[in-house]
Amino acid sequence: MPNCYNNMTEFYLASYLQFASSGYHYTGTCALGKVVDPNTGLVYGFENLYVTDASVVPKTPRGNTQATTYVVSGKLSEKIF
């Protein structure tokens, strides 16, 4: 990192900004409401397209999204089948 040789605080900040990532646990990208029926997971305007993953969760959970996704998928699959 140029210009950071004598200032470690600047170096760590620049490193963080350059290499930090979200971990790819996206949620809420298709939040229940206007696009998806909250009771069935059915996408409005389609006959057979369901969303049952973390994209329908309106707020990001504190932990890993895996358990939340299992619950959402399980509950909505019971309603679908």
UniProtKB/Swiss-Prot annotation:
Alphabetical list of Gene3D superfamilies matching this protein: FAD/NAD(P)-binding domain (3.50.50.60)
One protein family per Pfam: GMC_oxred_C
One Gene Ontology term of the molecular function aspect: oxidoreductase activity, acting on CH-OH group of donors
InterPro entries xrefs: FAD/NAD-bd_sf (IPR036188), GMC_OxRdtase (IPR012132), GMC_OxRtase_C (IPR007867)
PANTHER family (alphabetical): CHOLINE DEHYDROGENASE, MITOCHONDRIAL, GLUCOSE-METHANOL-CHOLINE GMC OXIDOREDUCTASE
Homology family: Belongs to the GMC oxidoreductase family.
Protein name (record): Putative truncated GMC-type inactive oxidoreductase R833
